[in-house]
């Protein structure tokens, strides 16, 4: 895959500088309709640099599509990640989330802040307290989602072309792996607590991505002096379209190698 140019605008963080050869623990949280397979190219690259990396799949999605797909909620998915981190015995976790995964990561931080050292949102939702993912969308999109809620049906994925995926190889790779999203996961509000002082916060905007809701989130993050921001010149699924740039951005934000 060709690597597109990357532009990063990193703001100073009040935390201590981290050694570039320090070993980190990364838990990568995929977005909606996907699974742990979304990190197929990023996870090995981080492991090759000596880091611990896991890519859990959320209930009802990916290879877990047979499990509670109709009834899973956002709380279910938050519990997936909380339990994963606790059962693995992880501490000082860098939690990397993409798209819907930002809702899950935010809820996870509220549950186990003592186990998290850093949050990286990759073109992800960063909810405000008491808001659901649907609240972030336009009225037109909300009406579309409401149809599935009213009919108690899971929500089919967006067309890959809408997400900027046009490479035939990527289309062939992704199409059989996409799974309908349990509608309850998008409608449940999330509890957001103030970010603990010890947790580093970063937001990455994919500049060719869909959705002005991500632009609004980026604007909000840019105004926060405690959030480091970066951009990648690619579409919404940066970990598949430009995995090298995605890895570099993650490592630069964490100031590690």
Predicted feature residues:
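Conserved HGGG/HGGXW glycine-rich cap/lid loop of the alpha/beta-hydrolase fold
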Residues: 22-65
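Short beta-strand immediately N-terminal to the catalytic nucleophile in serine-hydrolase-like folds
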Residues: 95-97, 122
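Gly/Ala-rich beta-loop-alpha elbow adjacent to hydrolase catalytic centers
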Residues: 97, 101, 105
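Active-site nucleophile elbow and catalytic-triad environment of alpha/beta-hydrolase enzymes
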Residues: 176-193
